[in-house]
Amino acid sequence: MNIFGTRLKFTSFGESHGVAVGCIIDGMPAGVKFDEEFLQNELDKRKGGSKFATPRKESDKAQVLSGVFEGYTTGHPIAIVVFNENAHSKDYDNLKDLFRPAHADFTYFYKYAIRDHRGGGRSSARESVARVAGGAVAAMLLREFGICVQSGVFGVGTFVSNLKEEEFDFEFAKKSEIFCLDPKLESDFKNEILNARNSKDSVGAAVFTKVSGMLVGLGEVLYDKLDSKLAHALMGINAVKAVEIGEGINASKMRGSCNNDALKDGKFLSNHSGGILGGISNGENLILKTYFKPTPSIFAKQESIDKFGNNLEFELKGRHDPCVGVRGSVVASAMVRLVLADCLLLNTSANLNNLKNAYGLK
């Protein structure tokens, strides 16, 4: 499906080499200040063009078509479109019948019996433009509640930061070309990416997301837990293969006496849970880690088959990220924002008092 969310519904559309990509956000309350400069800044952060990303250069200028009047949301669907300006579709002519390893080519073809071979169509990282635009709109609502979502890269390939989570430098990441959270490892991360690119290869990355200013009570029990929604959102990003919340995998190695977050004087003494208990936020920072596989598009010679079953050896052309996880950090923030904004709106009917308050009743 191309629709995400319950009360705040996000729909993305468009393909890598189509006319445009974009999104529709339905359910945003009226009266939220619309920050078009912030929207554009988020899209600019996601853009390629550097030696650490795809050479494909797009202006990515957002056009807001509806849902905003005199600088504020109207309560009606917000439509945003970004036109594709720099697609080189001829680079993919030799791939029309070929299944690229680790791409969605094989599965898309066998599910739909048709696929857009130009840049991967919907499975391209280009689709994330829509996610970032939608996440930027969600952030405008979260601002009203003091909720801040930040992401950055803490690992590239075998290089992984050993800093404690509270030591990650988000101010440095804002200035870093690769959104690096550990100043001492930035050069190692960059060299790893460039070495992969120069070897006609690619490399994976690990992204850390922190949400501060959290409120108590976001999320539902059982099947709509906040952690379930966040994992769903992050795993839906192309190239993501794993997500951790709080201690994540480490929790399976711990004892309860260590993993439990004790309380004293109305405060939690630790945050092993990553800010979520029983599927509901407890007011502590949300802590998430998202792991991206190496970009499937590499320039080394590879083996595969075509749709007729013939064995083939081929080399890719085109423009591709040597490490898709770098720009993926911007996308991770966007998806977390969409989840939290949706949960905020769902809470208006979580209990009778909330519902009465929405109508000014006691």
UniProtKB/Swiss-Prot annotation:
GO biological process, alphabetically ordered: amino acid biosynthetic process; aromatic amino acid family biosynthetic process; chorismate biosynthetic process
Gene name as annotated: aroC
Database matches in Pfam families: Chorismate_synt
Residues that hold FMN according to the record: R122, S123, S124, N238, A239, G278, K293, P294, T295, P296, S297, R319
EC number, UniProt record: 4.2.3.5
CDD domains documented for this protein: Chorismate_synthase
Cofactor note (record): Reduced FMN (FMNH(2)).
Subunit structure: Homotetramer.
GO terms under cellular component: cytosol
Substrates-to-products reaction catalysed: 5-O-(1-carboxyvinyl)-3-phosphoshikimate = chorismate + phosphate
Free-text function comment from the UniProt entry: This reaction introduces a second double bond into the aromatic ring system.
GO molecular function annotations of the record: chorismate synthase activity; FMN binding
Residue numbers binding NADP(+): R46
Biological source species: Campylobacter jejuni subsp. doylei (strain ATCC BAA-1458 / RM4099 / 269.97)
Cofactor(s) recorded in Swiss-Prot or TrEMBL: FMNH2
Protein name (record): Chorismate synthase
Disulfide bonds: none
Pathway where it operates: Metabolic intermediate biosynthesis; chorismate biosynthesis; chorismate from D-erythrose 4-phosphate and phosphoenolpyruvate: step 7/7
Keyword annotations of the record: Amino-acid biosynthesis, Aromatic amino acid biosynthesis, FAD, Flavoprotein, FMN, Lyase, NADP
Similarity section: Belongs to the chorismate synthase family.
